[in-house]
Amino acid sequence: MAGTEMRESMYNILICDDEKDIVNALKIYLNDSNYHFLEAFDGEEAVHLVDTNEVHLVLMDIMMPKLDGIRATLKIREEHSLPIIILSAKSEDADKILGLNVGADDYVTKPFSPLE
């Protein structure tokens, strides 16, 4: 019972990036005892994890295999209203505008600072 209560009080963050080093770096930057991290390495896996788990925040890369972050964000937005932050090396204004237009709440370019 206590374990279940602890799990429910955690803030679940889905990190979706095809680069394991980025996923690990984000987990280090965001290290907090109240965070539980889910990992996806492509957009299809990200959509599945959001559909099957209580996710409170998604950190989404754009350039990934199977389903890119733009399409994954669109699919997630069809059913969910949780915050999505795109983290991408694509830094053109058009990329940022597209990311925000498909439903991302913010867009941060890589490389990024933990303060961002």
Which ranges hold each PLM region?
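Two-component/phosphorelay signaling modules centered on CheY-like receiver
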Residues: 20-38, 52
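Acidic, metal-coordinating helix/loop segments flanking the phosphotransfer/catalytic sites
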Residues: 39-57
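Acidic catalytic/metal-coordinating carboxylates
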Residues: 42-45, 68-71, 95
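C-terminal output helix
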Residues: 112-116
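Conserved phosphotransfer cores of two-component systems
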Residues: 51-55, 75-82, 102
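Receiver (REC) domain active-site loop signature in two-component systems and cognate sites
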Residues: 62-64
